[in-house]
């Protein structure tokens, strides 16, 4: 189904009377330390899908008025959520992205982390006819598996411990995805249901992996689908280079001269999770993300100014890393 925003009057729905400002949109988010990265995410969204409205979830009190103006953002601050319980759950951690699920401005949205970029216009492939669209490439565990792979309890959940709370859930035959990119309907997982699972985790150490919202989101999507509570689908729309490789991305960038390529062979979300996609980190593949960072700065500073801005960002990041390492070393000597 074509992912097209339609003009409509704002409507009020949900328990907290949040106004829905568009039927569909992009959502991303950041804390203060990731602002320099989310600029690239926003630039990629605006470049490849200029008509799609964007919401920015902000975890903290830092200023984002420059981004709000540049990209015509709808800003959703975690600190301003009407529910104290929501604020406590989301503040200062990766669960901040859940603000869009319960208090966001779109009926249906595509989420991308601040270390991810839109890589081509993939809106033709977004399924607004389902409740949740998994952005992943394969079924992770065969339906007839007899052993639990060690990565499942590490990244997601321990099936044996989970069976105490949901004995009918089948952990096999599912696509376990990175929650750095997905699409879903607003309130696809009710808040009270989510908090119930959080209480399971509090009373059962090791039930869910230590990856913020990712373990619970995967559990809910697959368990609710199995029970027929939601309709979900899987589409190959998220590229994690450490998992999928980066040959396609390198081919796309080959003749782009540090600009967004005019032709993207396979549009999707390119997700640079793990090591931050810094220009001078030789252990991280970062060229597409650097292109998006440059695109953001070119909007204000031109070519030379864009490069200088990126280099200055890198200087601040590496200086911060050095300072933290030095402080840790001094702490060990004391």
Describe each model-derived feature in a short phrase.
Residues 98-149:
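GT-A fold catalytic core of metal-dependent nucleotide-sugar glycosyltransferases
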Residues 62-104:
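Active-site-proximal specificity loops/subdomain of glycosyltransferases
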Residues 25-31:
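A conserved hydrophobic helix/loop-capping motif in glycosyltransferases and polysaccharide synthases
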Residues 54-59:
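Short internal beta-strands
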């Amino acid at each position: 189904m074509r992912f097209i925003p339609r003009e409509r009057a704002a409507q009020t729905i949900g328990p907290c009377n949040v106004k829905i400002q568009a039927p569909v949109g992009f959502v991303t988010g950041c804390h203060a330390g990731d602002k320099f990265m989310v600029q690239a995410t926003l630039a990629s969204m605006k470049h490849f899908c200029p008509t799609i409205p964007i919401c920015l979830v902000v975890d903290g009190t830092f200023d984002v008025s420059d981004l709000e103006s540049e990209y015509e953002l709808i800003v959703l601050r975690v600190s301003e959520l009407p529910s104290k319980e929501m604020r406590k759950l989301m503040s200062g951690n990766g669960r901040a992205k859940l603000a869009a699920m319960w208090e966001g401005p779109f009926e249906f949205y595509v989420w991308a982390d601040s270390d991810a970029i839109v890589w081509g216009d993939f809106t033709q492939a977004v399924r607004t006819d389902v409740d949740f669209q998994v952005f992943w490439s394969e079924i992770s565990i065969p339906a007839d598996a007899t052993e639990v792979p060690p990565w499942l309890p590490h990244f997601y959940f321990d099936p044996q411990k989970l069976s105490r709370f949901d004995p009918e859930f089948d952990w096999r035959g599912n696509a376990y995805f990175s929650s750095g990119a997905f699409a879903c309907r607003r309130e696809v997982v009710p808040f009270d249901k989510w908090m119930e699972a959080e209480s399971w985790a509090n009373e059962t150490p090791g039930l869910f992996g230590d990856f913020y919202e990712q373990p619970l989101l995967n559990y809910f999507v697959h368990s609710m689908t199995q029970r027929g509570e939601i309709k979900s689908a899987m589409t190959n729309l998220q590229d994690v280079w450490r998992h999928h490789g980066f040959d396609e991305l390198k081919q796309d960038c080959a003749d782009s001269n540090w600009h967004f390529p005019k032709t993207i062979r396979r549009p999707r979300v390119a997700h640079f999770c793990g090591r931050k996609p810094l220009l001078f980190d030789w252990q991280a593949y970062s060229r597409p993300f650097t292109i998006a960072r440059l695109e953001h700065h070119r909007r204000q500073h031109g070519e030379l100014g864009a490069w200088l801005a990126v280099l200055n960002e890198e200087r601040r990041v590496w200086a911060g890393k050095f300072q933290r390492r030095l402080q840790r070393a001094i702490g060990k000597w004391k």
